[in-house]
C-alpha cells in the first residue's frame, strides 16, 4: 500500500520487496498479486504497465524521428511498436481492462506517458 501510494508501478514494487525485504513472490506471502492488492486499495493505474511502456517507447522513437527524418530503420521500428500497441490494446479491451472506446493516437500519446 505504502509503495503504491508513492506512485510506483507493480513491477517496481515487486523489485523493492524482493531486494530490500527478501520477499521472493508477493503472491506466495499474501495470496494475492501486487496489482490485485493495488486494485482493492484503489491505486490501479489507468493503463496497464506493459502498454504504458510500449507507448513510452513509441513516443521516444517519434521524438528521435523528428530530429532524424531519414532514419529508415527507426521508422520501421516505430511501425512495429505501434502495431504491438494496437494488438495489446485489442487484448485489453476484450479483457475489459481498457474501456471499449480507448484508442491509441500518436498525437495524444505523449500526454498519456507524461
From Swiss-Prot:
GO biological-process terms attached to the record: translation
Any one GO molecular function term: small ribosomal subunit rRNA binding
Organism name: Musca domestica
A matching Pfam family: Ribosomal_S13_N
Annotated family: Belongs to the universal ribosomal protein uS15 family.
Keyword Ribosomal protein found: yes
UniProt entry keywords in alphabetical sequence: Ribonucleoprotein, Ribosomal protein
Protein name, UniProt field: Small ribosomal subunit protein uS15
Keyword Ribosomal protein recorded: yes
GO CC annotation: cytosolic small ribosomal subunit; nucleolus
Amino acid at each position: 500500500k505504502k509503495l503504491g501510494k508513492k506512485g510506483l508501478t507493480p513491477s517496481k514494487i515487486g523489485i523493492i520487496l524482493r531486494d530490500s525485504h527478501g520477499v521472493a513472490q508477493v503472491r506466495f506471502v499474501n495470496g494475492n498479486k501486487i496489482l490485485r492488492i493495488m486494485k482493492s486499495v484503489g491505486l490501479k493505474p489507468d493503463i496497464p504497465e506493459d502498454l504504458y511502456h510500449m507507448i513510452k517507447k513509441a513516443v521516444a522513437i517519434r521524438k528521435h524521428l523528428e530530429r532524424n527524418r531519414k532514419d529508415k530503420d527507426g521508422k520501421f521500428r516505430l511501425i512495429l511498436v505501434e502495431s504491438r500497441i494496437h494488438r495489446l490494446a485489442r487484448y485489453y479491451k476484450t479483457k475489459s481492462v481498457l474501456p471499449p472506446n480507448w484508442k491509441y493516437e500518436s498525437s495524444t500519446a505523449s500526454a498519456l506517458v507524461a
